[in-house]
From Swiss-Prot:
Coiled coil: none annotated. Pfam families: RuvC (PF02075). The lineage of its organism: Bacteria, Pseudomonadati, Myxococcota, Myxococcia, Myxococcales. Its cofactor is Mg(2+). The keyword Protein biosynthesis does not apply. It is found in: Cytoplasm. Mg(2+) 2 binds at E66. The RuvA-RuvB-RuvC complex processes Holliday junction (HJ) DNA during genetic recombination and DNA repair. Endonuclease that resolves HJ intermediates. Cleaves cruciform DNA by making single-stranded nicks across the HJ at symmetrical positions within the homologous arms, yielding a 5'-phosphate and a 3'-hydroxyl group; requires a central core of homology in the junction. The consensus cleavage sequence is 5'-(A/T)TT(C/G)-3'. Cleavage occurs on the 3'-side of the TT dinucleotide at the point of strand exchange. This is Crossover junction endodeoxyribonuclease RuvC. It catalyses: Endonucleolytic cleavage at a junction such as a reciprocal single-stranded crossover between two homologous DNA duplexes (Holliday junction). Homodimer which binds Holliday junction (HJ) DNA. The HJ becomes 2-fold symmetrical on binding to RuvC with unstacked arms; it has a different conformation from HJ DNA in complex with RuvA. In the full resolvosome a probable DNA-RuvA(4)-RuvB(12)-RuvC(2) complex forms which resolves the HJ.
């Protein structure tokens, strides 16, 4: 299975495509889209073009995106939301189911520490995947893809026609057996 992880941003958009065969993880492609010092609409357009080309080239079957972290500035959250919208649109245009994960969930799945810093994320990308990301955006995108692969059995798409069915299937996997805690039916 090949998964695309996206760390959205309007100045730098990290991407990581990771393939899993059995227990083995392989980086198919990773990097950072840097649209340059352009007006916002043009930067978002360049990111969309870059993601479209990446999806056509790498052919992932699912996409995963980091959910919005508002931080200290409402303006930053709005700008991040615009970049996320572009990432979601690129995946939707390609017909990919999209899954979202909180930053702390990604860090926990990738490093074992939900509050991991940039250095720890970069080190884990090198150790776990043999990747050598130059920027934390790239390492974060790889981590998002790995998080999705690790959580996939219980993941529910963020939107789309399959969301309700996937949610029911995931809930069924979480249900306890027909026996109660005393072992009686």
């Amino acid at each position: 299975m090949i998964v695309l992880g996206i760390d959205p941003g309007s100045r730098r958009c990290g991407y990581g495509v990771v393939a899993r065969e059995g227990a083995r993880l392989t980086v198919v492609e990773s990097g950072v889209l840097v649209p340059g010092d352009l007006p916002m609409a043009q930067r978002l357009g360049r990111i969309l073009e870059g993601l479209d080309a990446l999806i056509a080239r790498a052919r992932p079957v699912e996409a995963s995106v980091e959910s919005v972290f508002s931080g200290a500035s409402p303006r930053s959250a709005l700008v991040l939301g615009q970049a996320r919208g572009v990432a979601l649109a690129a995946a939707a245009r390609a017909g990919l189911p999209v899954f979202e994960y909180a930053p702390s969930e990604v860090k926990l799945a990738f490093t074992g520490n939900g509050r991991a810093g940039k250095d720890q994320m970069l080190r884990t990308a090198r150790m776990l995947l043999g990747a050598a990301p130059d920027l934390s955006d790239e390492a974060d995108a790889l981590a998002i893809a790995v998080c999705h692969l690790a959580r996939r059995a219980f993941a529910v798409p963020a939107a789309g026609a399959g969301r309700a069915a996937a949610a029911r299937a995931a809930a069924a996997r979480l249900r306890p057996s027909r026996r109660d805690h005393r072992g009686t039916p």
